[in-house]
């Protein structure tokens, strides 16, 4: 269990009486950030809670005291900021507290240990300069901000490497929380040599323990070559000096039989293509960030796996495993179908790939997942595949964008949009550009940070660059009135892309188009784009005459137009 601060000191219990225990955000104490570790009362209450729990549970166990899982500074009060300045890490207040907690725990429960996460570069990943954590405090280094397409020793992860190498100066108990895969769609990528290099690095630095977060999409159903990957991890944790190519050969020979050579060619293609990417891949990677999934690459890999299946067609056991190895590739073809179809000469239809993917996934879930999970897993996939089945060719853009040559325009439809917490929904809409749209009830109440001059019922939308933390806001209904009825283009302004960016909607940011990052080209890093969102509105907040009783907005596409043409 991690991200536990509010388990120990719940704000719903204590904030009313003790707001000073919680983070200062600007000039206001807030209950939804972190704790104020320099507050004496908070330290006393937290220590009491930890000691009480150890006494009630297992005096020899390990107990997590780790920050909540959201970004931002821990606390803006002067004592906390002074610790940050002294120690050179935003996590300094937490580490200062843990340095004091450790001896108190050791005195009463000498076999107990306290763990915390070194997590996020803007929070606790960098180690402190002068604080030395006691021996009963375990630091679990969790590089969530990494480039997931490259090992930690790659130049793109230089900050992570520096932080990891410096941690042994501050602790004798360094563990790693390792992320083998990205979240988001379970697409294929080459990461086997990455993890082998990382485990050799961990051995050299002196890492003493691991937690492998091997629950990203695809692992439980054998997508992403997850069985091979899991086996490699278990072998490399014991002996990171083992030859990873020899391990892959050993596993594939036994697992795929006569199809093993083709599977190894597929793995080699993934490793080479992923390693050649010049852009970062974040932990929640969109389809667009998998830049190597070009039509040529996808079709070449499909030919390899066609040959693999033909080779083992007479052996049900090996054939099942080859089909499972193919699932992520089939998903990539579904998500990239427009580009595949545009390339021409595709020897299969979209529906054929969808059917094969569904059949293989269903069989894998029923044979591998807990029976109590079958219905939920299959229902989720059925819902997502439905949209690829019902989507229609894109309708023409409305004026004035219809006059712009196609090579200067890129469009993004909502089938791969990130829908936070499942609150927004993808729906069929005959009026939408591709027959589907993302629908959501808007947050009509303006938050406290909203510009005061905004009129009521505007829709907040914008662009966010995760690398530079640059935000760009726009407001549908600010300069001209929102209209109900059909879809209409609303401008988001001019922007520059990065390899990790997205377009978002509503004050809650619960609708996010991450695939726009796939437009980024490092050779054209400063290229400017004019951005538009195609939206329709309904409900009494927008028109008293509307027949719709609920307020909703629908986004059917986001359009990028090159500023220089």
What annotation goes with each model-predicted range?
Residues 1-44, 48-245, 295-302, 306-315, ...:
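Catalytic-core regions of glycoside hydrolase
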Residues 2-9, 443-444, 449-451, 480-482, ...:
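Plant-skewed but cross-kingdom recognition/interaction modules and surfaces
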Residues 67, 214, 539, 557, ...:
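Residues that line or immediately flank small-molecule/substrate-binding pockets and catalytic motifs
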Residues 233-457, 466-475, 488, 551-556, ...:
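Catalytic domains of carbohydrate-active enzymes that cleave complex glycans
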Residues 460-524:
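Extracellular carbohydrate recognition and processing domains
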Residues 492, 514-519, 533-535, 556-560:
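Extracellular beta-strand elements of beta-rich domains used
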Residues 501, 529-531:
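Exposed beta-strand face motif in extracellular beta-rich ectodomains
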Residues 504-512, 534-549:
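Short beta-strand-plus-loop segments that form exposed binding edges in beta-rich domains
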């Amino acid at each position: 269990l991690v991200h536990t601060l509010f388990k120990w000191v719940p704000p719903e219990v204590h904030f009313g009486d003790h707001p000073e225990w919680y983070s200062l955000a600007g000039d206001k104490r807030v209950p939804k950030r972190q704790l104020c570790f320099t507050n004496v009362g908070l330290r006393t209450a937290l220590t009491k809670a930890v000691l009480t729990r150890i006494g009630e549970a297992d005096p020899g166990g390990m107990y997590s005291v780790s920050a909540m899982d959201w970004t931002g500074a821990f606390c803006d009060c002067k004592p906390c900021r002074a610790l940050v300045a002294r120690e050179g890490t935003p996590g300094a207040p937490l580490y200062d507290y843990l340095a004091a907690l450790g001896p108190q725990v050791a005195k009463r429960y000498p076999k107990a240990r306290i763990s915390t996460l070194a997590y996020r570069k803007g929070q606790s990943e960098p180690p402190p300069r002068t604080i030395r954590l006691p021996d009963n405090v375990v630091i679990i280094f969790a590089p969530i901000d990494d480039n997931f397409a490259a090992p930690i020793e790659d130049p793109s992860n230089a900050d992570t490497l520096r932080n990891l190498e410096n941690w042994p100066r501050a602790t004798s108990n360094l563990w790693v929380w390792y992320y083998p895969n990205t979240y988001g769609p379970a697409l294929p990528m080459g990461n086997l040599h990455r993890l082998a290099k990382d485990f050799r690095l961990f051995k050299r630095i002196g890492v003493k323990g691991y937690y492998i977060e091997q629950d990203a999409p695809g692992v439980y159903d054998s997508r992403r070559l997850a069985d091979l990957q899991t086996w490699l991890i278990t072998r490399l944790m014991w002996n990171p000096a083992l030859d990873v190519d020899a391990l892959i050969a050993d596993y594939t020979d036994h697992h795929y039989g006569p199809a093993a050579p083709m599977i190894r060619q597929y793995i080699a293609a993934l490793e080479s293509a992923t390693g050649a990417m010049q852009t970062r891949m974040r932990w929640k990677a969109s389809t667009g960030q998998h830049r190597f999934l070009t039509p040529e690459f996808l079709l070449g890999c499909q030919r390899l796996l066609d040959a693999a299946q033909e080779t083992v067609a007479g052996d049900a056991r090996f054939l099942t495993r080859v089909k499972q190895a193919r699932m992520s590739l089939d998903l990539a073809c579904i998500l990239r179908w427009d580009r595949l179809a545009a390339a021409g000469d595709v020897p299969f239809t979209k529906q054929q790939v969808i059917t094969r993917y569904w059949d293989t996934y269903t069989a894998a879930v029923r044979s591998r997942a807990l029976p109590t999970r079958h219905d939920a897993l299959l229902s989720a996939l059925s819902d997502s595949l439905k949209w690829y089945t019902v989507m229609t060719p894109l309708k023409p853009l409305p004026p004035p964008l219809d006059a712009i040559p196609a090579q200067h325009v890129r469009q993004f439809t909502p089938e791969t949009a990130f829908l936070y917490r499942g609150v927004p929904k993808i729906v069929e809409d005959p009026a939408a550009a591709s027959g589907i749209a993302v629908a959501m009830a808007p947050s009509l109440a303006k938050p406290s940070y909203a510009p005061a001059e905004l009129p009521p019922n505007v829709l907040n939308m914008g662009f966010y660059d995760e690398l530079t933390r640059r935000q760009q806001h726009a407001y549908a209904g600010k300069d001209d009135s929102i209209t109900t009825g059909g879809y209409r283009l609303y401008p988001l302004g001019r922007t520059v892309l990065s390899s990790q960016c997205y377009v978002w909607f509503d004050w809650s940011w619960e609708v996010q188009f991450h695939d726009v990052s796939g437009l980024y080209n490092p050779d054209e890093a400063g290229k400017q784009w004019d951005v538009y969102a195609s939206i329709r509105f309904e409900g009494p907040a927008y028109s008293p005459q509307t027949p719709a009783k609920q307020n909703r907005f629908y986004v059917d596409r986001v359009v990028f137009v090159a500023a220089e043409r």
